[in-house]
Amino acid sequence: MDRLLQPPSSHSIAPSKFQSRPSPLLLHRLHSTNLSTFPSSRRLESRRISSISCFFRQNPSPDTSPGLNQSSNFLIASSQTDASKPNPGFIQRIVSSFEQRKTISAGMVILVSAIAALLLNPILVPPAFASFQTATNSGGAAVVGGKLLRTEVLTSAWTGFFAGCLHTLSGPDHLAALAPLSIGRTRMESAAVGALWGCGHDAGQLIFGLLFLLLKDRLHIEVIRTWGTRVVGLTLLVIGAMGIKEASEMPEPCVVTLENGETDEKSLKKKKIGFATFATGIVHGLQPDALMMVLPALALPSRIAGASFLIMFLIGTVIAMGSYTVFIGSCSEALKEKVPRITEKLTWASSLVAIGLGLAIIVSQFFGFSLY
């Protein structure tokens, strides 16, 4: 009767019951409550609830009341529902741990790659750098060589052109020989006379240059110079005489019935004058001063530069002579309209200059000096 009047909480529990071996269910719940994902307060509550529930399950007594069993069942159900709820902190920790592992693995890969690069650098880099440097040096040398060659060719060409112009215009025999032939002519005729004379001069220089290269030691320069100077003097005398003859001739009246015949006669006369001009240019070119064209071309470092100098020297001679004769012909044509008989006077003057220069050249040979 006394046991029925005492409350259930006052019942004493034998110590032997606490020393009994725990069941597997108790171990499982204790392990689940020890996880780090639960907060500290909730962890303590779950431990208490699970211990109480396990205690009542392992130690059922006939003295326990139905209310106590119901309360324990309610506590067990609430603990199960709390454990089944998802925890967002747990997911975040999983993600953060995965990212940390990923970062560590990427760092390891970078570290291994750096070590491999350091180990392979002395083996692979020097041969590659040497091949690259060789290719760069060879390409740079080719580019620099091409630029130097182009510069050398252009410089030689312009030098030859100006040398030909100066050589032609600075020779008194050239000017004296072409003046009588170009006075009283139109611009086109004067240009043709100058170009023919320039081509003949170039041909004579080429002939002399080839003879010099072929014969060399056998070629006596002094003998050729002496006789060449005399021939030039004689040609000047002939040109002067022809100019005086042309100036002294009176113009004949033109007849209509004989117009075709006169035209044919004039064209034949022009052909003869053209051939004479070309031949005069050859004679003036067959002089030792042709070495002024040959020797610089031979002294240049490359054959291309020498060829460019030679070609431009010849072109400069033709252009200079054509320009000179066009200038003289244009001046005579312009003065013809204002001053009557100016053509005859200019022809007389230029012919006398040519004759005087020819005589001076020939006579100077006998006195031991040369004007040419």
Swiss-Prot record:
Mostly expressed in leaves, stems and flowers, to a lower extent, in roots, floral bud, inflorescence and siliques, and, barely, in seedlings. It is a multi-pass membrane protein. Disulfide bonds: none annotated. Residues 1-78 form a transit peptide. Residues 7-20 have a biased composition (Polar residues). GO terms for cellular component: chloroplast; chloroplast membrane; plastid. Residues 1-20 are annotated as: Disordered. Its main location: plastid. GO terms for biological process: chloroplast organization; leaf development; plant ovule development. It is found in: Plastid, Chloroplast membrane; Plastid membrane. The chain crosses the membrane at residues 109-129, 161-181, 195-215, 231-251, 281-301, 309-329, 352-372. Keywords: Chloroplast, Membrane, Plastid, Transit peptide, Transmembrane, Transmembrane helix. Disruption phenotype: Various vegetative defects, including reduced leaf size, dwarfism, and abnormal cell death. Plants lacking both CGF1 and CGF2 are impaired for female gametogenesis and embryogenesis, and have abnormal leaf morphology with yellow patches associated with an altered chloroplast integrity; this phenotype is rescued by sucrose treatment. Together with CGF1, essential protein which supports female gametogenesis and embryogenesis, probably by securing local energy supply. This is Chloroplast protein FOR GROWTH AND FERTILITY 2. It comes from Arabidopsis thaliana. The gene is CGF2.
